[in-house]
Amino acid sequence: MNRQTGRVLAGLCALGMAAVIAAPAGAQTSEVQEKPPLYSYISNWAIPRAQWADMAKADDADRAALEKALTSGTIVGYGSDVNLIHRPDGETHDQWWSATSLAGVMNVLDQFYSSGSTTSPVLASATKHWDELYVSRFYNWHSGSVKNGYTHVSLYKLKPDASDDAVEMFSKSLVVPLLEKQLAAGTIAEYEVDEEAIHTDAPGSFLIVYLATNAEGLDKVQGAIEEAIKSNPLGGVAFSSMTDISAHRDELVRTNASYK
């Protein structure tokens, strides 16, 4: 998905604000550790509405190759998304896969180029196309598949004077503990905190992403965020001191995904 574009400002803006609550200092950060890098390749497409059914068929056709890569361990997850909040300059669809190495990501991409699926008629009909490559060190998921889930993505941009470890601090202090609880409850199937691995935009941005298994999960996560903020309303002040709120954007997409 284009994990850098917009919807509903309330969303995980609240989660980002809550992320600085760190109560007490170091109590939660000592429990959350960085994981090995997880790389995600996202291919975004703006497809004319008349070709949306063909795009769904193209996603189905690609599934066999992705499932084979998942089974072999080349990748650890894959999926496709349909954008639910349309913008004049945005994508309508995307396809993505994740691996614990750049080689895993690139090997799958090479397979698609070799098979000719990247030049299919429906992709040729796209009015816009762009790719993104992200890396995460804070993430988790449940093994299995999700059909017609909801992925919520929030983009934030750090201020120039923000500390070098700001994203790590946000992640360890609340984002991971909060979303781990939602994962354990089955409210979400996956989450990650992403930064660009290949910078197609200026450095300093990060994403908070979670996949709700159903629409009710969006409300449950939002409720958990609101409770976290109530526990320390000053958290938003600290978060605002390190992020440029004018650059904040959200995205909501319908997701089919599988994880190893």
Residue ranges, per PLM feature:
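N-terminal secretory signal peptides that target proteins for export/translocation
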Residues: 1-7
